[in-house]
Amino acid sequence: MENKMFCYQCEQTAGCTGCTGNSGVCGKSANTARLQDELTGALIGLARAAEGNEHLVTEEMNQLVLEGLFTTITNVSFNDETLKLLINKIEDTKKKLVPNCFTCSGSCGKNNNFDMNTLWTTDEDVRSLKSLILFGIRGMAAYAYHASVLGYTDETISKFFYKALFAIGTKDWGMDELLPIVLEVGEVNLRCMELLDKANTTTYGTPVPTRVPLTIEKGPFIVITGHDLKDLQLLLEQTKDKGINIYTHGEMLPAHAYPKLKKYSHLKGNFGTAWQNQQKEFDNIPGAILYTTNCLMPVKPSYADRVFTTEVVSYPEIVHIGEEKDFTPVIERALALGGYTKERHMTGINGGAQVTTGFSHGTVLSVADQVIEAVKNGDIKHFFLVGGCDGARVGRNYYTEFVKQSPADSIILTLACGKYRFNDLDLGTIGGLPRIMDMGQCNDAYSAIKVAIALAEAFKCDVNELPLSMVLSWYEQKAVCILLTLLYLGIKNIHLGPTLPAFISPNVLNFLVENYGISPISTPEEDLKKLLNN
């Protein structure tokens, strides 16, 4: 290819077509992008080697696949050396599956890595469907990885990653062969989200509605960001009785609602807003910052000496906490920095001083009778699921205005970091229920699905017949696998924004419009009018 790189997997991709220059909009270099492609091609080679050798596949190999896919998600790794190490590990693993191939002079292709340039330059519809599969399994790998950290794995899920990778590397497949696999990504991701939900709730308890302050107390503190609850638990244990407060950031906010994490008195509150504001919010911060997963942005000099990474997150010259999970360097840095000398009163983007989280399916379904009665009485006339990823693109204030303008007899269900656009608003209550219910992290889309299905069963109708509208925002690959799950479930008339994915070709988009009624967002006023009149 003439391009120095090609990447169009995130919502902010250059020109809504693809990043092709010296670096991507996310900040990764062209060399990093090429190494991510090489890593993906090596994973496809591993899937080829596993074909027919399934009996030789081990849990260690499965974990390597998850790690490799997770690493290529937007804003996870900017470290070329880490990518090279993973590529080498995959090559060594292939030798265990097909040792004879490495001494064979033939060219059967059994262990060949895949050249991703052939994907980026192929027929646009094939490229589009294979991209949906690839980006979908990247997102799903993150969920499977988090579940595995808590000791939960599923053979069906593990096997599907190989199947999907193999499909991406198959040359002669067209739309007829690829479309079913696209929807299968959604099917398996539903199973994966269910597994992660089970892992989280079994380990930490069923989330309960919890008010979380946005004020930072004086004294030493650590900000933990990302999604990994196990890392948070370990950090809380290691900081007990050390005079250090812990604050969540971004997608870690829902951790406050889990009973076995709430018990730690030094888990104090939430720092700041969504991921795209971190460079401003972390500027000269007098505390340490621990990244457990995405979203990591290029680190600025004003806080680089207090940033730490762990798990698959990696950034050049930043201290990485390895598998031993000894957070001593993070703790020592927090103590040395000392924190703020007096309380710092932070707010949400609308000026609110606190937010509420913890409305998982376990909580919402426990008051299902109350919800159903409110609908029957006419107190609740509509449900909106307004959630997904946040991002920096101008126009995402659409979601703030949509929620502000939603009628007083409607409930807003939300999840993922898109909620930061409005989660500090006070919209009051309906029949004792808050109008805004934060269901959790992006993987807690499973909670929204469970609630929707339960409501449909209660009213003896199809989910699409409920007074329920989905207005979603997307940014990275976890949003892709969630969207595919909704399509697998047959959920229609989803409004998606702020832009449609660059990797959706006109023909594939036409298929989605004709079969599922997907449409781009327009204005809050127009969309509310349309959705409320359906």
Show the residue positions of the predicted features.
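Anaerobic metallocofactor- and corrinoid-dependent redox/one-carbon enzyme cores
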Residues: 2-32, 36-37, 41-45, 51, ...
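Electropositive, gly/pro-rich neighborhoods at or near active sites that engage anionic ligands
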Residues: 44-203, 209
